[in-house]
């Protein structure tokens, strides 16, 4: 729906929703090597983000699959945009600047009989950039200080 118009904020919100649905859902993953949502990450950060994810959020995925079965793992059930705004230019480490959008979100997981889904991340603070018409996540955090 967002892509039918040219509302950059709505497009950025859609990117974040799709990222959350793929990255934080484990029921469709075969192992910790299969990091979801990478297509929404700023291109030059792709490899480092994938590696960091495998050592952090995905580090125990293989164990969870073998102990509890993939069907009993995390599956995002709903996503709420709690705040969004045009954020001005965002400067990357390379010195490049891009138009950016700030998105705050919360989400929930389907209940699981095997794991405590409430012990996993359920909030995110995202910066989305317009990289020559391609909307990409340049950074995100699980808490805001």
Q: What does each model-found stretch correspond to?
A:
Residues 1-72:
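Core segments of small alpha/beta cavity-forming domains
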Residues 26, 30, 34-37, 49-53, ...:
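Generic local-structure boundary detector
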Residues 65-89:
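A short, amphipathic edge element
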Residues 82-145:
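Exposed beta-sheet edge and beta->alpha loop/turn motif
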């Amino acid at each position: 729906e967002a892509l039918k118009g040219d509302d950059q904020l709505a497009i950025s919100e859609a990117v974040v929703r799709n990222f959350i649905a793929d990255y934080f859902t484990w029921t469709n993953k075969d192992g910790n090597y299969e990091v979801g949502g990478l297509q929404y990450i700023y291109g030059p950060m792709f490899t480092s983000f994938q590696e960091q994810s495998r050592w952090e959020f995905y580090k125990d995925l293989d164990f969870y699959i073998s102990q509890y079965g993939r069907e009993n793992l995390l599956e995002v059930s709903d996503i709420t945009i709690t705040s969004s705004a045009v954020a001005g230019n965002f400067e990357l480490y390379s010195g490049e600047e891009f138009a950016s959008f700030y998105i705050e979100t919360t989400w929930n997981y389907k209940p699981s009989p095997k794991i405590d889904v409430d012990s996993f991340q359920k909030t995110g603070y995202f910066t989305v950039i317009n990289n020559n018409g391609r909307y990409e996540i340049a950074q995100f955090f699980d808490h805001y200080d």
